[in-house]
């Protein structure tokens, strides 16, 4: 009789879960790897859903891995296999297709859009979470001419950008007094907002949708009432007001949860045989010190690599500088590092729609916000956290290449 193989079950086949499966093999893990997905599609890239796909540049999902890659890597991909419950005491997962016993479980359940129950449902009221949602939005965009987007974060602005490129009249409504209030500085948000305004997108900041008006049949929204009483007619309403972690399974299993599934810096949950990664987690490196959830492909990949290395007995890789990107209209936005609450800001203006905002603390570069300057962001990522020497006099001069100001050869 052959020796029993360890089994790692991964719940969720988004960026984090799929990356974890392949990193396990890359790091020499010889156990059984099961990757469970409730979706019908092979694991696919999420970022294009709010951009290229809506513009009909993609008719099928951009897959994370080729369909035959899973069998070649000895990864058991189980599609349309919705996990129903987890029983930590017996280390069992019950799903719509059966049950699995695990030696280690990785939760990569992701997040879902924050729903606005007060607005109800309608055929042309849309949220974006997955491939099916994107298909519905694309269909509605093809029929609509006046689009209202509720939410001035990245998802809302990316969808607004796609609609604008299609020649639609777009209004973005944001309850905060500025765009991107949770993720970028006010100055950078203003810069990005000006690009949207310059392309004809209407921005209604400091406003909320109080209620919707429906057509006679009641199945479609034809207008929204704002908090100031104004009525905006529309053919389509897209809601992008943030996300919530999918942690129902974790909560029901008795795992510690708060604003996400709580994990330490090595992605251990409160159960020693369960890890959690990606958009569903909130890192709590020490008691009472919970970090904000990070929702990005880079973070999902880094956490997947970390857990796979740990389960494979490999050295845990060093933490990388966090980074993020977004495409909006003619703007390529790149962010890296952690913007400090206080510190020095250096703005390098290159003219037109190009700018880099560098954030220093104790004479060290700690973050960058860049628009249409991806090279600056790559250089900054190399310098952040490296105790790198800076030439402040040259750093403030946009005519001096950033490479030279950072003393890179």
Swiss-Prot record:
Enzymatic class: oxidoreductase
Record has Nucleotide-binding as a keyword: no
Cofactor(s) needed for function: FAD
Keyword Oxidoreductase: yes
GO CC terms: cytoplasm
Binding site for FAD: 7-38
Binding site for NAD(+): 151-159
Keywords for the protein's UniProt record, in alphabetical order: FAD, Flavoprotein, NAD, Oxidoreductase
Enzyme Commission (EC) number: 1.18.1.-
One family name in Pfam for this protein: Pyr_redox_2
Disulfide partners: none
GO molecular-function terms, A-Z: oxidoreductase activity, acting on NAD(P)H
Function in brief: The oxidation of alpha-terpineol by cytochrome p450-TERP requires the participation of a flavoprotein, terpredoxin reductase, and an iron-sulfur protein, terpredoxin, to mediate the transfer of electrons from NADH to P450 for oxygen activation.
Name used for this protein in its record: Terpredoxin reductase
Organism from which the protein derives: Pseudomonas sp
Gene: terPA
């Amino acid at each position: 009789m052959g020796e029993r193989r360890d089994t790692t079950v991964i719940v969720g086949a988004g960026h984090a879960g799929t990356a974890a499966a392949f990193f396990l093999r890359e790091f020499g893990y010889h156990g059984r790897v099961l990757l469970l997905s409730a979706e019908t599609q092979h694991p696919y890239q999420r970022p294009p859903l709010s951009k290229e796909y809506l513009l009909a540049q993609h008719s099928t999902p951009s897959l994370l891995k080729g369909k035959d890659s899973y069998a070649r890597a000895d990864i058991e991909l189980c599609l349309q296999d919705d996990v129903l419950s987890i029983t930590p005491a017996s280390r069992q997962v019950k799903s719509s297709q059966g049950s699995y016993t695990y030696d280690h479980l990785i939760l990569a359940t992701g997040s879902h859009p924050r729903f606005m129950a007060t607005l109800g449902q309608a055929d042309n009221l849309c949220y974006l979470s997955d491939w099916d949602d994107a298909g519905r939005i694309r269909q509605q965009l093809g029929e609509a001419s006046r689009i209202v987007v509720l939410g001035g974060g990245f998802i809302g602005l990316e969808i607004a950008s796609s609609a604008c490129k299609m020649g639609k009249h777009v209004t973005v409504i944001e309850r905060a007094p500025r765009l991107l209030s949770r993720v970028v500085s006010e100055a950078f948000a203003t810069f990005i907002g000006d690009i949207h305004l310059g392309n004809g997108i209407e921005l209604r900041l400091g406003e909320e949708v109080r209620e919707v008006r429906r057509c006679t049949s009641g199945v479609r929204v034809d207008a929204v009432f704002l908090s100031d009483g104004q009525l905006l007619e529309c053919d389509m309403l897209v809601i992008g007001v943030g996300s919530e972690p999918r942690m129902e399974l974790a909560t029901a299993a008795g795992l510690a949860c708060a604003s996400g599934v709580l994990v330490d810096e090595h992605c251990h949950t409160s159960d020693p045989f369960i890890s959690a990664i990606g958009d569903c987690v909130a890192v709590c490196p020490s008691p009472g010190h919970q970090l904000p959830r990070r929702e990005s492909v880079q973070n999902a990949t880094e956490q997947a690599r970390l857990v796979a290395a740990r389960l494979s007995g490999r050295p845990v890789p060093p933490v990388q500088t966090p980074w993020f990107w977004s495409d909006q209209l003619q703007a390529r936005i790149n962010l890296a590092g952690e913007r400090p609450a206080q510190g020095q800001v250096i703005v390098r203006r290159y003219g037109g729609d190009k700018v880099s905002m560098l954030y220093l603390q104790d004479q060290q570069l700690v973050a960058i916000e860049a628009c249409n300057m991806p090279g600056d962001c790559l250089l900054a990522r190399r310098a952040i956290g490296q105790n790198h020497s800076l030439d402040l006099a040259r750093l403030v001069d946009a005519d001096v290449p950033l490479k030279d100001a950072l003393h890179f050869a």
